Regions:
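Structural signal for beta-propeller blades
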Residues: 8-11, 68-70, 111-114, 171-174, ...
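Blade-level signature of beta-propeller repeat domains, shared across WD40, Kelch, NHL, RCC1
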Residues: 304-340
């Protein structure tokens, strides 16, 4: 997980026992600084995907929001080796997407932008033609709205033909770029308006439907992602919690949203046609629930207020059984957690 320290960002590494509990085994400097958006309370970067793992190439990518850079680590079991620190070609990077040798970083400030890279021999190579300014609205300095008026995540579609950007209140839209094998990234995205929804984070279900957390109504919505780049809503279910911002897939067809304002996790089960067939139980966490990651039958959730990681086992019903928690030094406000 990333602690996003303003004086120097770090990645904290844990060993996982067969029972799912965590033990801290190392801390690695990223070579860059963490950052904090104006108005952020428990989530410094107000994003999903600040730390991303490429399992195929054993590479870990981290944003350094305070120094406009990203770091590349080699993953060697439970050890990391810093390979690169390079520019994000924008202001305040918050999210990274990785797929099949392609990497995109999302910059949040100055209206937002994305920058693409290729991976060569474990190193990132910037692609000049893969930069796009998003042109989103910018919060008035001093308003305290920067953390909501910045984009939240960049993500690939499962087949790699689309690149999705959630814009939160900066655009109230889900923006979809097309990726052509020959011509690369489309010049402009298809902008899918979601008035008042504050689309924050996204993942895909096992059938390829787009799931989006909507922080405005505190809901999880499912969409069909069309070839044209448009999205068609299939379902939307309220969590009945506050500040539903992050979403993570669990075992089978289970999905879990983090509700920062309620310090809780809400479970869902998806159906074959993109219906969110049932809302499972809501489970309390430590204060300031933010990013989450799952591996096997376990789910790990960051608590941004105190710098905690809650440990859960996902039962056959989708319910969460608490295994305990750990307190990570200097991790309050940090975002970005992955398991491999």
């Amino acid at each position: 997980m990333a602690n996003d320290r303003l004086e120097g960002n770090q990645v904290v590494v844990f060993d996982r026992s067969t029972e799912g509990t965590l033990t801290q085994v190392g801390t690695y400097n990223s070579g860059g600084k963490g950052g904090k958006l104006e108005g952020a309370v428990v989530d410094n970067t107000a994003s999903q995907g600040a730390l991303t793992y490429d399992e195929a190439d054993h590479l870990l990518f981290a944003v350094n929001a305070g120094s406009d850079s990203l770091s590349v680590f080699s993953v060697l079991g439970d050890r990391l080796a810093l390979r690169q620190v390079l520019s994000s070609y924008g202001k305040f990077p918050v999210s990274i997407a990785v797929r099949a040798g392609s990497v995109y970083v999302l910059n949040a400030e100055e209206g937002g932008s994305i920058q693409g890279y290729g991976v060569s021999a474990g190193n990132l190579v910037p692609i000049p033609s893969a930069y796009r300014a998003l042109g989103l609205s910018v919060a008035t300095p001093g308003s305290g709205e920067q953390f909501t008026h910045t984009p939240g995540q960049v993500a690939f579609s499962p087949d790699g033909s689309k690149l999705i950007v959630t814009t939160k209140a900066a655009g109230q839209s889900v923006d979809v770029f097309s990726i052509d094998p020959v011509n690369g990234l489309s010049a402009q995205p298809v902008v899918n308006p979601e008035p008042g929804a504050v689309p924050f984070a996204t993942t895909f279900d096992k059938q390829g439907h787009l799931l989006v957390t909507e922080a405005g109504p505190s809901a999880l919505a499912s969409f069909q992602l069309n070839e044209s780049g448009t999205i068609s809503q299939l379902d939307s279910v309220l969590t009945e919690q506050a500040a539903t911002c992050w979403v993570e897939g669990g075992p089978g067809n289970t999905y879990y949203t983090s509700n920062a304002g309620s310090s809780s996790i809400t479970g869902f089960q998806s159906g074959a046609r993109g219906r969110l067939l049932s809302k499972l139980q809501t489970t309390p966490t430590h204060p300031g629930t933010v990013d989450a990651t799952s591996v096997g039958r376990f789910l790990y959730v960051q608590g941004g207020k105190e710098g905690t990681v809650d440990e859960f086992e996902v039962e056959s019903t989708g319910a969460l059984k608490s295994l305990g928690f750990i307190l990570v030094p200097s991790a309050a406000g940090g975002e970005g957690i992955v398991a491999g």
